[in-house]
Amino acid sequence: MQDQTTTRWYHYVSYFFGGAFLANTIPHLVSGISGSPFQSPFASPPGEGLSSSLVNVLWGMFNLVVGYVLVARVGRFELRQTRHAVVFGLGILLMAVMLARVFGKFHGGNL
C-alpha cells in the first residue's frame, strides 16, 4: 500500500497549474466585480476583444474552482512544505508575467 504523504511528480504539476489558474482568476474576477469589460477567451477575437463583466465573473470563478481542485484536491498540498510552495508560486509568477505582457498591450502596461 502506498504512503498517503508521498508527493508524486504529478502532484507538483498539479500545484504549478493550480497556481496559474488561481493567478488568472484575479484580473477576470476583479474586472467583472467592478463592472468593467475585459479580455477573455470568449470575446471576438478571443483574448483580444472585450467580454462583459458577467462573462468575466463566470470565467474568474471557473478559474478559481479549477485552481482549487488542482491545489487542494490533488495529493496533500502543504503550504509549509517549501517544494510545494515554490512550485505553486512559480505557477502564479509565470501566469502573472504572461498576463502582464498580454494585457499590457491593451491597457498601456508594456512601456
Question: Where in this protein do the model-derived segments appear?
Answer:
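Membrane-interface extramembranous regions
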Residues: 2-111
